[in-house]
UniProtKB/Swiss-Prot annotation:
This is Homoserine kinase. It is found in: Cytoplasm. GO terms for cellular component: cytoplasm. It holds the Pfam family GHMP_kinases_N. ATP binds at residues 88-98. The keyword Transmembrane does not apply. The gene is thrB. GO terms for molecular function: ATP binding; homoserine kinase activity.
Length: 309
């Protein structure tokens, strides 16, 4: 790959309630890497969301890229990487998965593009342990997947024709903490109920039955009940969204603390205004599903960008 080039990776919202560690949706918040030649590896940023990132080989993007290269028995040339992002860290919008996917794509480009999309998802899922954020960042749109010890399977479910309204708390919530509060096991009865709800969620998503999607989002048994104490107002927001707004439903975005609301197309700003008035302590944003996934462009001398692949 000829330097310089630019990699753009969307953020994502995982789970949509009961689709735990399996369902994810790409959103139009982005991590961008601008890659140029360098005498040694160096990472820099001007983004407020990335202040304090490691500038050398301890950077997650480099660590992932180097891992991919070592698995392919290749050596990466040193580069300067300018990182910019409007994906908030530790808020449940797939910031770490976006960095992992960016590292995989960085290695892919520097090594002559040997990886297919499914290879990227496999590398990313092995690193993170599940595909619910990785796969949407690779493919864009809605993705349903499962990650096994020997293989990772994902199905692309198209791009939902929805507005996404997000309530973003000021506080961070690290995924490690949010996972640490989950139980080691569920009873057989709870597992069956959780599985059936998740099955209906996926079927409703694929049939674009948004009212039913909203009903299933609030019936999760896998993580919502255990994370209520970590996310103030979660139960109240879910009830308010369902009963007082036009949105179909709400759920934690990933591990939280951001809360995701699915809104009819074109009505997101109206829902946003209602929620901002009701919950002034949160930042309330209207987003859309990303339909592209990873994008790579060659940066020309006049700063124009030429799509690759």
């Amino acid at each position: 790959m000829t330097l310089p080039f630019q990699i753009t990776v969307p953020g994502s919202s995982a789970n949509l309630g009961p689709g735990f560690d399996s369902v994810g949706l790409a959103v139009n918040r982005y991590l961008t890497l601008t890659v140029t030649e360098g005498s040694e590896w160096h990472f820099s940023t001007q983004s407020a969301d990335l202040v304090g990132i490691p500038s050398g080989k301890e950077n997650l993007v480099y660590q992932v890229a180097e891992h991919v290269a070592s698995q392919l028995e290749k050596t990466l040339p040193p580069c300067h990487v300018q990182m910019e992002s409007n994906i908030p860290l530790a808020r449940g919008l797939g910031s770490s998965a976006a960095a992992i996917v960016a590292g995989i794509e960085l290695a892919n480009q520097l090594l002559g593009q040997p990886l297919a999309a499914e290879d990227k998802v496999r590398f990313g899922s092995l690193w993170e342990g599940h595909p619910d954020n990785i796969a949407p960042s690779v493919y864009g749109g809605l993705v349903i997947g499962t990650h096994l010890s020997t293989e990772t399977h994902v199905i692309h479910g198209g791009v939902p024709d929805l507005d996404l309204v997000l309530l973003v708390p000021k506080e961070e919530l690290l995924t490690k903490k949010a996972r640490g509060i989950l139980p080691e096991s569920l009873s057989y009865k709870e597992a069956v109920r959780g599985s059936s709800v998740s099955n209906v969620l996926v079927a409703a998503l694929l049939k674009e039955n948004w009212e039913l999607v909203g009903e299933m989002m609030v019936r999760d048994v896998f993580h919502h009940p255990y994370r209520l104490g970590l996310v103030p107002h979660l139960q109240e927001v879910i009830r308010y969204v369902k009963e007082e707004t036009e949105a179909y439903g709400a759920a934690l975005s990933g591990a939280g603390p951001t809360m995701l609301c699915l809104s009819p197309k074109g009505r997101g700003e109206w829902v946003q205004k209602q929620l901002q008035k009701q919950y002034p302590q949160f930042e309330v944003d209207v987003l859309k599903p990303d339909d592209q996934g990873i994008q790579v462009h060659r940066v020309l001398s006049n700063q124009q960008q030429l799509p690759i692949g």
